[in-house]
Swiss-Prot record:
Main location: membrane
UniProt-annotated location(s): Membrane
Entry keyword set: Coiled coil, Membrane, Transmembrane, Transmembrane helix
Bilayer-spanning residue ranges: 32-52
Coiled-coil residues: 9-31
Annotated Pfam families: DUF4519
Membrane topology, as annotated: Single-pass membrane protein
UniProt-recorded name of the protein: Single-pass membrane and coiled-coil domain-containing protein 4
Signal peptide: none
Length: 59
C-alpha cells in the first residue's frame, strides 16, 4: 500500500530496535567523550584561577 505524504510511518519493531541502539550509543558517547572533556575544562579553569590569585612571592 502506498504511503501518503502527510501521515507519519508506523514504527516497526526493527525501527524501534534501531532507535534504542542509537540512544544507547549516545549515552555511551556521553560517558566516553563529554565527561572527560568537561573535567579537563574545569581543571583548566581551576588552575587558571589558582595561578591568577596566588600571592606574589617577594624576597
Amino acid at each position: 500500500m502506498r504511503q501518503l505524504k502527510g501521515k507519519p510511518k508506523k514504527e516497526t519493531s526493527k525501527d524501534k530496535k534501531e532507535r534504542k541502539q542509537a540512544m544507547q550509543e549516545a549515552r555511551q558517547q556521553i560517558t566516553t567523550v563529554v565527561l572527560p572533556t568537561l573535567a579537563v575544562v574545569v581543571l583548566l579553569i581551576v588552575v587558571f584561577v589558582y595561578v591568577a590569585t596566588r600571592p606574589a612571592v617577594t624576597e
